[in-house]
């Protein structure tokens, strides 16, 4: 009989543990404790499909921090929320914390030296926020456009007017590439 079961490939149910009672293997979010209760409520409302995200619903209590985040300072207390209006609605937004300063800064990836020519990245020379070390807002910095990287189309050799925007140049290049059947080395 045992060999017959193996040949058919049937699975058998596991035997209960030797303790005699049901095993105590509750998921972590159902275990007793004040830290896990908000997570359990969030999970229950999501899994059951009864999550009601309308403004009239009582909000869930704040979720506890993960152990790796407990030692970090609270970013909400250091950065005030900003408000912006779209149409007739006003939204609040908490900006991201400022980037860490030091050798790992990625600012050098986007800013070319002042003397570099042909850089497609706009220069932010006139931005006082970057000089002071804080995050600039959209109103503070107006990018200064660098000269065009291409003076003429490499496909049709048409000279680009200096008054053309980068979008116009890109549009022309895309049109020429779409019509071209030859390989071009840039």
From Swiss-Prot:
Zn(2+) binds at residues 153, 156, 172, 176. GO terms for biological process: DNA damage response; interstrand cross-link repair; translesion synthesis. Disulfide bonds: none annotated. Pfam families: FANCA_interact, UBZ_FAAP20. Keywords: Chromosome, DNA damage, DNA repair, Metal-binding, Nucleus, Phosphoprotein, Zinc, Zinc-finger. GO terms for molecular function: K63-linked polyubiquitin modification-dependent protein binding; polyubiquitin modification-dependent protein binding; ubiquitin binding; ubiquitin-modified protein reader activity; zinc ion binding. InterPro entries: FA_core_complex_assoc, FANCA_interact, UBZ2_FAAP20. The modification Phosphoserine is found at residue 119. Residues 1-30, 50-90 are annotated as: Disordered. A zinc finger (UBZ2-type) spans 150-186. GO terms for cellular component: cell junction; chromatin; chromosome; Fanconi anaemia nuclear complex; nuclear body. The keyword Phosphoprotein applies. It is found in: Nucleus; Chromosome. Residues 7-16 have a biased composition (Basic residues). The keyword DNA damage applies. Component of the Fanconi anemia (FA) complex required to recruit the FA complex to DNA interstrand cross-links (ICLs) and promote ICLs repair. Following DNA damage recognizes and binds 'Lys-63'-linked ubiquitin generated by RNF8 at ICLs and recruits other components of the FA complex. Promotes translesion synthesis via interaction with REV1. Component of the Fanconi anemia (FA) complex. Interacts with FANCA; interaction is direct. Interacts with REV1. The UBZ2-type zinc finger binds both 'Lys-48'- and 'Lys-63'-linked polyubiquitin with preference for 'Lys-63'-linked polyubiquitin. This is Fanconi anemia core complex-associated protein 20. It comes from Mus musculus (Mouse).
